[in-house]
Amino acid sequence: MARQGRYGRMSRGSTIVEFAIALLVFVTLLVAIIEFGWLFFIQHTLQYATREGTRLALVGRTVNDPSGNPMTRVDSIIRTIRDASSLAVRPDAVLISIYPVSASFGDPANWENIQDAGEPGDYMRVRTRVVHTFFTPLIGGFFPDGRITLQAEGTYRNELFDE
């Protein structure tokens, strides 16, 4: 039978304590990877949806609603963006602004509330925003109210399409 050393009694259970500390660090890193992975997925999807909306917008095309009726250009752009972003976020959570930009490519006043698809040849901007709430307070604690606003935009020139 092996004899316990002088410190044998004091080291009893130290393995489980070390494992618990290592597990805590590992789980924290795993949660952070999942949280930020989801955040980047939403950002990428929002950028993709914005690009899809601008592609439709710049050629002056429209889409049909579910019952087959043609939609306006603005509604077509909004629907395209919401459909393309629906995998990552609720479609109604995406805030969409469509507006003409000035010659200096500056934003007009109150651009957040504008939805105007513009005329042929106009320089336009589509800006989308969504508020992301983190799943865990562990990561959310680093952000105000545990949320962050993700934004994507596309600037383009309308082609000289027939209206």
Q: PLM features: residue spans?
A:
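Short, conserved structural patches
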Residues: A2-R3, R51-E163
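Alpha-helical assembly-interface signal, strongest on the long, hydrophobic N-terminal helix that forms
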Residues: A2-I81
